[in-house]
């Protein structure tokens, strides 16, 4: 074989090798919060995010432009309202999703998620399932979406910012035996609160407080009698019931001897920042600290 042919052969081998490396580099494999290993052909530039928290994470990573669809309840930041909305939760609409031709659909772990994942994947849609009960799982979600979007460094930066805020608040918070009752669902719908292994429980601890329902696990329904018996020092409302929420709680029959009611220590929190497993939990803990310590901005 002549030197010229050898050189040509080696050049072809190099080109093929580079092509294989490029193909491998464009393949993204992740394990979602269901423990499922998912392989996606990258780069990922077309995404549907069904949950508000996942939309917020994507924007925090600088990936808002990749959103071609959003769940109808996704509303932050304001720019996301320009993205086409699709039905979410139990009302998921397969045709709407298929029409948007996304590379991946990101959805949260809910009661109907397994059936919906099966339906979507049977129709050729890649699905990533997220979950975020506690702060560590929020970090996992951020890293997961960061890997999918090729924004791993940005994901770590977002997490570092959150950790710094939590550490700063914890450092200036005195430990106390005082308790917080988080009202997640209002009385008219049946009271629900946050227990152990939730990010709300952890926000209370960061602020030096105890969770009045630390003995329950996750998010559970509670009774008026339980709230009255536990006599919380503070009540934090994350019900999204608007400006009248505090007045409604202050006027509840039988609650008048609760310490929080007697002291007027009822806080109508930004329910979106405090209920979504997303970067704005850092904002939520600052606001919670300010309420607990009487700090005005």
Predicted features along the sequence, with ranges:
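Extracytoplasmic ligand-binding site segments that recognize negatively charged/polar headgroups
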Residues: 113-115, 130-144, 177-199, 243-244
